[in-house]
Amino acid sequence: MASSVMSSAAVATRGNGAQASMVAPFTGLKSTASFPVSRKQNLDITSIASNGGRVRCMQVWPPINMKKYETLSYLPDLSDEQLLKEVEYLLKNGWVPCLEFETEHGFVYRENNKSPGYYDGRYWTMWKLPMFGCTDATQVLAEVEEAKKAYPQAWIRIIGFDNVRQVQCISFIAYKPEGY
């Protein structure tokens, strides 16, 4: 009998200890009506955080006869010196240069399906093999010149591939055909 009294007392003590450490449930934020208002309310529409007033000065890029291809394509065409600097940056970061070309469409297009897929213009034909071990930017530009001679009506882009993470890190147009 003493053992049963002892165990029930232990259970009761534990139950009280657990109830003492309970936290009250969240009941919401308190009203700020009790606090004095220290600033006047500005009902002017220009004080509301919005970019609605700025929309009038934004412009849309005209897509007719002015297609854009990659991130740097909104800038003027890169000169040979600028291309050399971009390729040097690519090599300095340890990325593998790779050339790709496209003979028909230099931009994303959807011909076979409305959803993105393999044949929507994102995947171009690779020029030779990736230039593993390349440390000279002029070698990459020499390959660009060779690709231009072989396909003068093609778009040519240079890609920097990180072979450790297996991702494409940089991509830019190195050559566009006449009229684009």
Curated annotation (Swiss-Prot):
It is found in: Plastid, Chloroplast. Belongs to the RuBisCO small chain family. It comes from Solanum tuberosum (Potato). One of its GO terms (cellular component) is chloroplast. Gene3D superfamilies: Ribulose bisphosphate carboxylase, small subunit (3.30.190.10). RuBisCO catalyzes two reactions: the carboxylation of D-ribulose 1,5-bisphosphate, the primary event in carbon dioxide fixation, as well as the oxidative fragmentation of the pentose substrate. Both reactions occur simultaneously and in competition at the same active site. Although the small subunit is not catalytic it is essential for maximal activity. This is Ribulose bisphosphate carboxylase small subunit, chloroplastic 5. PANTHER family: RIBULOSE BISPHOSPHATE CARBOXYLASE SMALL CHAIN 1, CHLOROPLASTIC, RIBULOSE BISPHOSPHATE CARBOXYLASE SMALL SUBUNIT 1A, CHLOROPLASTIC-RELATED.
